[in-house]
Amino acid sequence: MELKLHRHGIRIALASVFGAMLTATPLVGDSALANGIVMGKVFWFHLSMALMAIGTIVTIGFGRKKGISFSLPDGLLLLFAGVTLATYDWQLGPEPEKLLFGGQLIVLWFLLRHFLTEAPCLKFFFLFMLMLTGLVEAVWGMQQLHGHVYSHHSLFRLTGSFFNPGPYSGYLAVVLPVCLWTAMRFQKGMHYFGWVCVGAILVVLPAGMSRSAWVAAVVACGWVYWAERIGWEKTKAIYSRYKNVAVPFFAIVILLAGCAFAGLYGLKRDSADGRLLMWKVTGKAIAGHPVTGTGLGGFPEAYAEMQGQYFGTEEATDKEKRVAGCPEYAFNEYLQIGLEQGIGGWIVFVSWLGSMMYYGIRNRQHGAVGGVLALVVFAMSSYPLQLPSFWVALMFLGAVCVTEEGTQRARIFAEKLLTGLLALTAVGLFVGQKGNYEAYRRWGRMQMLYNNKAYESVAEDYHSLHDKLKHKPEFLFEEAQCLSKTEQYTEAIQVLERAKRLSGDPMIRYMIAKNRQALGDYREAERELLQAIEILPERLYPYYLLAKLYAEPEFYQEDKFRAAAGAVLTKEPKVESTAVREMRTGIKKILEKK
């Protein structure tokens, strides 16, 4: 008996250690990698999953005879994974790394379900680790605000371990309700620790200036307080007692909420208008792919195409054209999932989130439910699910919500076999992405030469990594720039044409036009620039390139040249800059010669 308990303890200890490593994913970064802030987290996650899987395989015979009670969220998660695979564009292959990461997330979900069933004490341990990451992030942010630690963005002092304040604030908002629940639920040590975490997060959260995170934090913490201190019975009793004033009370609450949202809108009006435009255009794009979707990674191209069509109609306003951009994300995860996985995928995903929270309420895991709720609200106006940190947190919070006490099962061998297969899958996925680390490390070194304009010396290195990183539009743009600067214009265009299918970045179209102009293919260059103007009609740079194109002796068209030059000289830029002044000076010089 003692030996069995000892073996079980080893198994749970390993699960605790590797689970703690996984919850620490947001804190990891690797400056040696290209995009090391995100990719460092991804590779750390894969490594931690491989270690957890190996530990699971080694100790698979040590577990107690408790079986998982499979539930609706388990099935919905698998169904959503199936929809994602079914709608994916396998020929283009826009997001191979996300597929590997998603596979590991599914393995993590079921391994967590397995361990939490065997050892329910791990539920609070994992929540504690999430709180600890929130505390570390909050202290990190304080250090950045006081100038003791550098941020990861030149324009913002506060980023924590993230690239900008938006996702940083969102992560704190997800952890905050868990901390509040701990402070309200426990006594003595954990009670005080919970309040310390709450206080630390509240110090830095306002400084992040993320309205989405503020709303998520208020909604989730309000719900946690209601669930812990009030509940349905008290709510019904209060309603019965003060029934006559209920309607005026709710009217006042709605009015105050409306005033609060109006204030948040006015805080950064252009940003809010930009997001409203994104949501409108994404909604129109969904109508074009309601069933099949565009597939994972298909958002940027579909969005750019639809925005170009929308701006060609009378419905588009000058204000919308002024605030428009070509985002990588929809800044609303539900709309992005609706576009990429179709309406069916959207229904499955929303049902999965809802079922997790339902099980969490039923199991009285109000802290975990609060964390999921904060993420659900934050995802309505941001992009948390495009970052690994939020997915890892969601898996832990969701597994805590869903997992109930295990039962004695007759088919314990089958369950152990399934657990072993899951662990082997995690190891296989780790092996499948192993070469990616070296590729990103090499890319990081190459970027130093690229940024120093050593295009000729690094062009061959970019070519050698093409097959490994051809799904990254940033890499393709840099590769094409090297080819263009070494006068390999045809090859540069081929690379950029692929990048155009992966990204809505207008610079890709501008680069294609410049390379076609260098080859003397003026008609195609003109077509590319006109398409870019349709997508972003208020940008000055494509008009500048058009004016230079029409000024070419072999393609000179005076009326078109003067129209494009006039746009450069008269259009109001978003921000006055040195680049704008240089473009206008250049156009004036060309006009003087003409």
List each language-model region with its residue ranges.
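Register position in tetratricopeptide repeats
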Residues: 451, 485, 518-519, 552-553
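Alpha-solenoid helical repeat scaffolds
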Residues: 443-444, 474-478, 507-514, 541-545, ...
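Conserved structural position within tetratricopeptide repeats
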Residues: 467, 500-501, 531-534, 567-570
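Hydrophobic alpha-helical transmembrane segments in integral membrane proteins
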Residues: 260-277, 423-453
